[in-house]
């Protein structure tokens, strides 16, 4: 489990064996119920208990803006900002030849279907800035270049409160090249 190291796992296992209540059974049922009830949204791939997630079903959101992310979990931090009021599309991964993940393994076909079906005017790529994220972005930009849609990517740079001494060269380069006028 993410965030649970060997020591924590040992403590949890010992607690499960020693506890005198039915709490471990309740936790196991809750985990099983969650796995049964929650599945990917048919449109964007985010988590939902219905066919379509709350974000895709929200008519107050702009249907013209589509933010493409790597994983459904990438939607959560973007939503916490309340800065984006469009819709999302999770690819379910990124192109990674070393891991034997190609374009056919991602939700690219579904993205193309959405572009044909929906009135999307702008795609915002919010993929990681590593080699695989860049390869995926470049592949999609090349694939979509004939579509009548504006393609942008989220800005990159220094984190709020972060100093220059802790930033890597790529982050500093992107911060300098993506500067804005004051």
Task: Describe these PLM feature segments.
Residues 40, 52, 74, 91-94, ...:
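Glycine-rich, flexible loop/turn motifs
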Residues 8, 20, 85, 112-182:
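Long C-terminal interaction/binding lobes of large macromolecular proteins
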């Amino acid at each position: 489990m993410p965030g649970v190291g060997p020591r924590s796992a040992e403590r949890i296992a010992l607690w499960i064996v020693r506890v005198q209540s039915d709490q471990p059974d309740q936790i196991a049922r809750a985990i099983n119920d969650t796995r049964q009830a929650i599945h990917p949204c048919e449109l964007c791939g985010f988590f939902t208990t219905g066919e379509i997630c709350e974000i895709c079903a929200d008519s107050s959101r702009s249907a013209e803006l589509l933010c493409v992310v790597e994983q459904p979990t990438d939607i959560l931090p973007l939503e916490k900002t309340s800065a984006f009021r469009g819709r999302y599309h999770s690819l379910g991964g990124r192109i990674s030849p070393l891991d034997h993940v190609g374009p056919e393994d991602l939700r690219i076909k579904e993205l193309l279907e959405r572009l044909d079906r929906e009135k999307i005017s702008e795609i915002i790529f919010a993929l990681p800035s590593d080699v695989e994220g860049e390869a995926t972005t470049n592949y999609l930009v090349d694939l979509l270049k004939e579509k009548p849609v504006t393609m942008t990517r989220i800005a990159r740079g220094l984190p709020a409160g972060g100093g220059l001494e802790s930033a890597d060269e790529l982050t500093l380069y992107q911060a300098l090249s993506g500067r804005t006028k004051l």
